[in-house]
A protein has these predicted regions:
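Bacterial N-terminal signal peptides that target proteins for export
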Residues: 1-8
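Chymotrypsin/trypsin-fold serine protease catalytic domain
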Residues: 128-201, 235
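Conserved catalytic-core segment of clan PA serine endopeptidases
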Residues: 25-43, 50-56, 77, 81-142
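Catalytic nucleophile loop of clan PA
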Residues: 199-225
Length: 254
């Protein structure tokens, strides 16, 4: 998914129009509302704002350990500009209200991402299959609380319903948490990159969590949003597999 420039997203939001639900054949992201944003595990999701080169961009992420946030690798590293700078995480943002604002002290990307993205391009399926990134903080963004996660790709391919979250800034303002539900599962494309043509994601949602209810009221992060297309409609995710679990256990364990 292309990075969403903050200036461009503000202009695009002006042209957004809501299509009646009865005419939709594809699920599109919609705001969850301020009250839901404050509840677990939604309150662990945040807006990431960062600088790459001479421009500012927006993405999403989830607190998965006391001082660690899981996001997309393309939010923190780019083949042209290298590492992102001034990475700010606005947890549980709803309009002007932000639960906590923290700045990352360290950035991480999945082992093969830089090589693959440089060779095939960050918009390639191969790059999306390695598109895991992490943020480390000196202070806990949620006071020590965090969302649980699980590495189980069967949750995503068996057709079980999952909820995909992020701060979409393509057709929305980027200041509200959006959600879109997948009821039909995802199809494997390359490695841990899965796709669905039954839903779409907006720019700015990249790095946001894919949540599965593994038990009543027990939601776990099982993947992250990495790619989206309105024409043709499609949404791509990077599933948490064994390699993804090793990445979290190694770099996002604090």
């Amino acid at each position: 998914m292309r990075r969403t420039n903050l200036i461009a997203s503000a202009l695009l939001a002006c042209f957004f129009s809501t299509i009646p639900a009865f005419s939709q054949t594809v699920e599109n992201p919609a705001p969850v509302g301020a009250d839901v944003t404050k509840k677990m595990p939604f309150a662990m999701v945040g807006q990431a704002i960062f600088r790459s080169g001479q421009s500012w961009y927006e993405g999403s992420g989830t607190v998965v350990q006391s001082k660690s946030v899981l996001t997309a690798a393309h939010n923190v590293w780019d083949p042209v500009n290298g590492w992102s700078t001034n990475v700010q995480f606005n947890r549980a943002r709803s309009g002007a209200a932000i639960a906590t604002r923290t700045f990352a002290s360290r950035l991480y990307v999945f082992g093969s991402y830089r090589t693959v993205a440089a060779r095939y391009g960050p918009e390639s399926s191969r790059a999306f299959a390695s598109d895991l990134g992490g943020l480390r903080f000196n202070v806990a963004p949620a006071g020590g609380a965090y969302a649980g996660w699980r590495a189980d790709t069967r949750t995503l391919t068996a057709g079980a319903p999952v909820l995909c979250l992020g701060y979409g800034a393509e057709f929305h303002s980027g200041r509200e948490l959006l959600a879109v539900r997948s009821a039909s599962g995802f199809i494997p494309v390359v490695g841990a990159f899965l796709e669905s043509t039954a839903l779409t994601f907006e720019g700015g949602m990249s790095g946001g969590p894919v949540l599965s209810e593994v038990a009543p009221d027990d939601f776990r992060v099982v993947g992250i949003v990495v790619a989206g297309s309105a024409t043709p409609p499609a949404g791509g995710i990077r599933a948490l597999d064994a390699a993804g679990a090793a990445f979290l256990a190694t770099y996002l364990r604090y």
